[in-house]
Every structure is written in structure tokens, then in C-alpha cells.
Amino acid sequence: MKKIFRTLCAALALTVCLCLPAFAQEAIPAQPAAKEDKVVTDLTGRDAFLRDVKGFTTNFGGPYVFAQADHKSPAEPYGAAPAEGSVATLRIYTMSDDKGDASINASGHAFVSVTNVSDRDINVGGLLIAPGKAVTIGTRGNRSEHSGIWYDLESYYMYYIPDYYYHLYAMQTSLDAGQLEVLNRGLRRADHWSACYNCSAFSEAVWNSVCADALSAGRPASPANLQADMLAKYSDKTAYEPPIPYDYAVYYGCALTPSREFA
């Protein structure tokens, strides 16, 4: 009987471990981007429209819930040196031209990136990012593999299709270890997307949780609104069409599943 009990306990413990979300487990090293010599294309015309319609009508995620850091950093000019004591730089990007993201007005895309400015690996969403390396983070509802949070998908597109995100604007702020933890806690609850709570709502929530200079994506949220607010408030801190590094493979979801489609 004791042997059976021990066996059942062991099986239960194994099941619990397997079912733990990625953020409850030890962070994993992000795998370097393959950067294969290949031609990558995306849907256009009617096919892109139908993909957006499907995303618009089949995803119903709610608001992005990010706690507010107990201290917030000011916005900085894009490319500025990180503030003293920082471990990372957070950048927010937005473009208002339609490129297939099914947001409420089907126009544009918004996302963020985190760059490691420390001398050791940092945990971003469960991925270990090496010093000097960066990862992009965004949400989408119109990709067949997954609806929700994606890591380095934007980097993948910009590497293989350099004009994929054109007329892109960006600004940045610095993160210390405590602010990075606030961001990570929010990412654990951000694996969803909907027409109202879309990529721009996600980017706004991330930014405002740690930056004292707030941005608004409007209501309903859209990349166009986010871009307009960024340029109206902080035009002296924005960069136009900044480079997007492609350091790591593409992952999606809280389970950090490596993408097959975007490998």
C-alpha cells in the first residue's frame, strides 16, 4: 500500500511540474536566430484581408493587466545611454500603416523590445537574454500558429522583409531590476488578443507600467492613435524607422513554444 501511495505521489508531482506555466519554471536560454538564407513573403490582398477578418472575429481577450512599478523612469531620447543602475532598455514601436494586423481599424502594428544593458543574462518573459542582446514582444490575433503573445516575430519579419514595418516610430526608457520584474509579471497574463485589446493596447500597458511619461493608444486602441500621441507629446525623443535587431528565434505563448512557421 505504501509503495502504491509513493507511486501516486510521484506521478502527481510529475504532473504538476509538467503543467506549470513557463513563468513558474526556471527561465530558459533564448536560442540564437538561425538567419537562414531564404526568401520570406507574407499574405497580401484578399488573403491578408481574410486572415485579418478571422483574427478579428475569433479572438476575444480582455484587458492587459500590468501592475504599476513603485517608481517609474522618464522617457529618454531614442538611443540615449541607459540610466545609472539600469539592467535593460525598454523601447516602444508603432506604425499606423496597414500591414496585416487585425486591430480595431486594421491599421498598423505596435510592439515593444527589451535590450539587456547589464553584464549578465536577464529574464524577459521566461527567456534568458544575453548582455547586449534584445528581444521584441508583441501580441497578434491573425497568425495560424498562435493568437496572443509573440517573442521576436517582429525581428524575424524585419530581417527577412526589411520594409515590413515602414514609417515606424520608437522611443525608450530605462528599466532597473524591480521594473523588469513588474514587466515580467504582466507578461505572464498577456497571452491573448482581441479587436479592442490588441497590439497597441498591449504596448501601452507595458510602457505605462514602468515609464513616468505615459502614452495613450486611445479608445478603441489603435497603432495610429499610439503614434499620434507619441509624436504629439514626445517628438523630440522619437526615432523614425530605427533598426530592429534579430538576435533570437521566434517563440510564442506563456509556454514559450518555438515557432515552426517562423523558424
Task: Explain the meaning of each model-derived region.
Residues 25-28, 37-65, 181-263:
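Activation targets extended, charge/polar-rich intrinsically disordered C-terminal tails
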Residues 173-179:
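A short, structured loop/turn motif at beta-sheet edges
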Residues 49-167:
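Glycine-rich catalytic cores of cysteine/serine-nucleophile enzymes that process amide/ester linkages
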